[in-house]
From Swiss-Prot:
The keyword Lipid biosynthesis does not apply. This is Protein LTV1 homolog. GO terms for biological process: ribosomal small subunit biogenesis; ribosomal small subunit export from nucleus; ribosome biogenesis. Residues 406-417 have a biased composition (Polar residues). GO terms for cellular component: cytosol; nucleus; preribosome, small subunit precursor. Residues 198-211, 419-447 have a biased composition (Basic and acidic residues). Residues 184-197 have a biased composition (Acidic residues).
Length: 475
């Protein structure tokens, strides 16, 4: 068979490459949760070497994939708009279309994977940005100081060095009012003394007060205007603050003045003559037992109760009422009545924090920890419980035998010192004797181990039989 060229899966000449980018903030679908937040952006096939060579002409020598030429274009150059499709062929001047190498005729993708055709003027993040620009609700002086437009050279905006002394210094009007007030007080005191001594009529006192007031009254003002109506006695308090509005540190502009007038009008409805019926107030809270207020209330209650209580000092019969004859006769007889007096139980007049934890019927105590009993383990060889039977020491015969072995005076070959000038025959004989001694020791050790094992097993069986009250029988 002739060799056929295999058709490639992707034709590079007709393929179109895309970049997966985030959707623009000005895209209307950026706030849509159902729309994908990443879109496909077609790549522009421009050779990197040509672009870098073009960048070197303008002094850009960065060796990366970023296009720096887009920042070097003339912003005021001539431009011409040519309508074209996003993936269409470029338009040539002779009226023919030059097909691109990357044809999109075979691409069928949904419109949701591409950016929207129409975009908004303001992005989504800029809509949530704080307000910028001039703020009309700010004080003009504050805005001028923030913008460095404050006129520091204006003499009205400057403070004197002794502005504190000038502010505390009383004015001429205040000094005159203080002098008039002091003179009026002195005159009134002397007039009271004269009235007490002479005991004159009200008309005389009125004439003297009038003559004294006329002397210190200001020209052009009546007498009562100065004596009974001073500036500091003017009613300048509001209904809802009890303070003078003019004494506030804030400058009262039109809006604040309107705000104060509305509150004044609102509280005017609740004056004493128009207050009407009010709901009962629900008072909640607590008071200390040893408070002075509570003691005063209790004392007032006891005093009122003592005044209303009527006590009889002597018991006397009514004069107009006659006692019956039966009662007079029965009064002579004495009757014995047995009265059982019970001791009054002592009542608690106080309570401590300990008494809240218990009472006379409940006596709490600590719960003692009882350890869990140990499990009985059985021997895998004999089936006898371990660590239950008492352990016995060596018998008298075994102790005697052990002492005999330990106290033996027979020298052992292994413990004899080796001579420095030992011959070969002596060395062989010594080694042979050591081997025989070790052999005998192993045999003896094995026999002792077996004897001890049998004796231990016999004793455990005897103790077990004694515990179960079973006598051992020999067959």
């Amino acid at each position: 068979m002739p060799h056929r060229k295999k058709k490639p899966f992707i034709e590079k000449k007709k393929a179109v490459s895309f970049h997966l980018v985030h959707r623009s903030q000005r895209d209307p679908l950026a706030a849509d949760e159902t729309a994908p937040q990443r879109v496909l952006l077609p790549t522009q096939k421009i050779k990197d070497e040509e672009r870098r060579a073009e960048q070197r002409k303008y002094g850009v020598f960065f060796d990366d994939d970023y296009d720096y030429l887009q920042h070097l274009k003339e912003p005021s150059g001539p431009s011409e708009l040519i309508p074209t499709s996003p993936f269409g062929a470029p338009y040539r001047g002779d009226g023919r279309e030059e097909p691109l190498a990357t044809s999109t005729s075979g691409i069928k993708l949904p419109s949701s994977v591409f950016a929207s055709e129409f975009e908004e003027d303001v992005g989504l993040l800029n809509k949530a940005a704080p307000v910028s620009g001039p703020r009309l609700d700010f004080d003009p002086d504050i805005v001028a100081a923030l913008d460095d437009d404050f006129d520091f050279d204006n003499p009205d905006n400057l403070l004197e060095d002794d502005f504190i002394l000038q502010a505390n210094k009383p004015t001429e009007e205040e000094e005159g009012m203080e002098i008039q007030k002091s003179e009026a007080e002195d005159d009134s005191e002397w007039e009271d003394v004269d009235d007490e001594k002479e005991g004159g009529s009200d008309d005389d006192r009125y004439d003297r007060a009038g003559s004294s007031d006329e002397d210190m009254s200001a020209p052009g003002k009546p007498l009562g205007a100065i004596e009974n109506h001073f500036f500091w006695e003017e009613e300048t308090k509001s209904r809802f603050t009890e303070y003078s509005l003019t004494s506030s540190v804030m400058r009262r502009n039109e809006q604040l003045t309107l705000h104060d007038e509305r509150f004044e009008k609102f509280y005017e409805q609740y004056d004493d003559d128009e207050i009407g019926a009010l709901d009962n107030a629900e008072l909640e809270g607590s008071i200390q037992v040893d408070s002075n207020r509570l003691e005063e209330v209790l004392n007032d209650y006891y005093k009122e109760k003592a005044e209303n209580c009527v006590k009889l000092n002597t018991l006397e019969p009514f004069e107009d009422q006659d006692l019956p004859v039966n009662e007079l006769d029965g009064s002579e007889e004495e009757e014995t009545v047995t009265v059982v007096l019970e001791e009054a139980k002592e009542k608690w007049d106080c309570e401590s924090i300990c008494s809240t934890y218990s009472n006379v019927y409940n006596h709490p105590q600590l719960i003692k920890y009882q350890p869990k009993p140990k499990q009985i383990r059985l021997s895998s060889k004999t089936g006898i419980p371990l660590n239950v039977l008492p352990k016995k020491g060596l018998t008298a015969k075994q102790v005697e035998r052990m002492q005999m072995i330990n106290n033996s005076d027979l020298p052992k070959t292994s413990t004899q010192p080796r001579l420095k000038r030992e011959s070969k025959e002596d060395k062989r004989a010594r080694k042979r004797a050591i081997k025989e001694e070790r052999k005998e020791r192993r045999v003896e050790k094995k026999a002792n181990k077996l004897a001890f094992k049998l004796e231990k097993r016999r004793q455990e069986k005897e103790l077990l039989n004694l515990k179960k009250n079973v006598e051992g029988l020999k067959l």
